From Swiss-Prot:
This is Glucosamine-6-phosphate deaminase. HAMAP family: GlcN6P_deamin. InterPro entries: Glc/Gal-6P_isomerase, Glucosamine6P_isomerase, Glucosamine6P_isomerase_CS, NagB/RpiA_transferase-like. GO terms for biological process: carbohydrate metabolic process; glucosamine catabolic process; N-acetylglucosamine catabolic process; N-acetylneuraminate catabolic process. Pathway: Amino-sugar metabolism; N-acetylneuraminate degradation; D-fructose 6-phosphate from N-acetylneuraminate: step 5/5. Catalyzes the reversible isomerization-deamination of glucosamine 6-phosphate (GlcN6P) to form fructose 6-phosphate (Fru6P) and ammonium ion. The gene is nagB. It catalyses: alpha-D-glucosamine 6-phosphate + H2O = beta-D-fructose 6-phosphate + NH4(+). One of its GO terms (molecular function) is glucosamine-6-phosphate deaminase activity. GO terms for cellular component: cytoplasm. Its EC number is 3.5.99.6.
Length: 241
């Protein structure tokens, strides 16, 4: 586990974008695992800058998103389909057929999840998986006490996660209570993992992930066992290390 401490959010975002860009330059048909939420927004903005100013080419890149709210349609502004399109995809030359995001409106959850895992495998596996971390130590929507052997599945969202995500909605009551998410096993099969965190609110989760015992109570602690994980955090998130 490599830890990179930077000064602030902007530096974190640019550092992460450079790692992603280097991967794409090295392998033009790279497979990227992508995350949503507030943390990676700056990274996406910087990748768009690299596309516009340095001709970073996304035309052969494949992407798989970590998760999607269950019961939320693609065109809903709160969906992660909408987030990815409007914060990243539509500003690059990535091809629609290379974009993979779980279907939150599926009537066959088991098949949707199984097909997603199979498509990741058939693509050759994820080259770099981008992660954030929740205040409760979740990665993706893998909440505390998750089964480390779980693949992509339906999860019930933790109360802390619902509270944290309520800032994106008009009220807490509008936040979905479940989601489809890559499982820990799916995430751990990624060749490289890039975890981003900023702010003092994430400091305790970062400490437990890095220095705590490996336990389902802190899902991110499993990353101690991954052989190529880079943690990029600002000084505030690193304050307990």
């Amino acid at each position: 586990m490599k830890i990179v401490t930077v000064n602030d959010y902007d530096e974190m975002s640019k550092f992460a974008a450079k790692i992603i860009a280097s991967q794409i330059i090295l392998k033009e048909n790279s497979v990227l695992g992508l995350a949503t939420g507030g943390t990676p927004l700056g990274m996406y903005k910087e990748l768009i800058n690299l596309y516009n100013k340095e001709n970073l080419n996304f035309s052969k890149v494949q992407t798989f998103n970590l998760d999607e709210y269950y019961g939320v349609s693609d065109d809903n502004p709160q969906s992660y389909h909408y987030y990815m399109k409007n914060n990243f995809f539509k500003f690059t030359n990535i091809k629609n057929e290379n974009i993979n995001i779980l279907d939150g409106t599926t009537s066959d959850i088991e098949n949707e999840c199984k097909s997603y895992d199979n498509k990741i495998l058939s693509s050759g596996g994820i080259d770099i998986q981008v992660l954030g971390i929740g205040e409760n130590g979740h990665i993706g929507f893998n909440e505390p006490d998750i089964n480390f052997e779980a693949k992509t599945h339906l999860v019930k969202l933790d109360e802390k996660t619902i509270e944290a995500n309520s800032r994106f909605f008009n009220s807490k009551n509008e936040v979905p209570t479940s989601a489809l998410s890559m499982g820990i096993k799916t995430i751990m099969q990624s060749k490289k993992i890039l975890l981003l965190a900023n702010g003092e609110k994430k400091a305790e989760a970062i400490f437990k992930m890095v220095n705590g015992k490996i336990s389902p109570e802190v899902p991110a602690s499993i990353l101690q066992l991954h052989n190529d994980t880079t943690i990029i955090i600002d000084k505030a998130a690193a304050k307990m290390l």
